[in-house]
Amino acid sequence: MLADIHTPVGIYLRLRDRFRDTVLLEGADGHASDNSCSFICVNAVAGAEVRTYDTLEVKLPGEKPETVKIEDGRRVPELLWSFLKRFTAEGDVREASFAQAFYGYTSYDAVRFAEPSRLGGRREAMIPLMRYRLYQYVIAINHFRDELFLCENHIEGLPSESDLLLSLIRSRDVPQYPFALTGAETSDMADADYLRIVDRGIAHCRRGDVFQVVISRSFRQGFTGDEFNVYRTLRSINPSPYLFYFDYGDYRIMGSSPESQLIVRDGRATVHPIAGTFRRTGDDETDRREAD
């Protein structure tokens, strides 16, 4: 269907109160023919989750979660791949592949599963280290062509509610809730300590130990109301081609990025470090030439 009167944010707001585990991934670069899609994933039916450094939880459609003990962290990619291979998909239409995928995240601390020597002692995980879900529905919006696709995974024993989704997509009602800050902002590190770490990072770059380093610290802020307003503000003050908002019930993850960090296409994985970005012009040919 045509998508010129629909927005990913509007659709997400209409669906999230009616369907559990709804997540949003936005491709906001509507001037580019590639990677100009947004996705709203609705109703998780299966998935895998590394809850702690020692525990992997997997779930199949219609079954109770199964816990797998992680004996060797280096086998986590193998365990996840083994789980993914338990699924088969039919159909060769390109748009169908939007639904035939697992959506989720891999946290920074999960790097120890690939390279255990990279990190020191374990930090307490506030959220699962990795979480990926297969969804019954994926709404895909191609901003370049103004097309909207409602993709559904037909799973035995799982009733379809696609008609309800379509009615909500077409609805004019967009529920919104207030948001307010409470208390003062706090950080886990004083300004002076943070600046000392920045100086160390600069020194490492000058010595040639690294060509890029990201220095960060955590902030905390109390609030009341709907966290989605924070995401809406983020996409307004920091508009980026790639944005995401994952609402998992007991925690939320949101963010924006100027570049796709990893692209997998035709069996090849390509990494795009942030240090290699370039100014976008809006012209595909010029942008492609600058990237090369």
Regions found by a protein language model. Name each.
Residues 1-292:
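Extended alpha-helical targeting/anchoring segments
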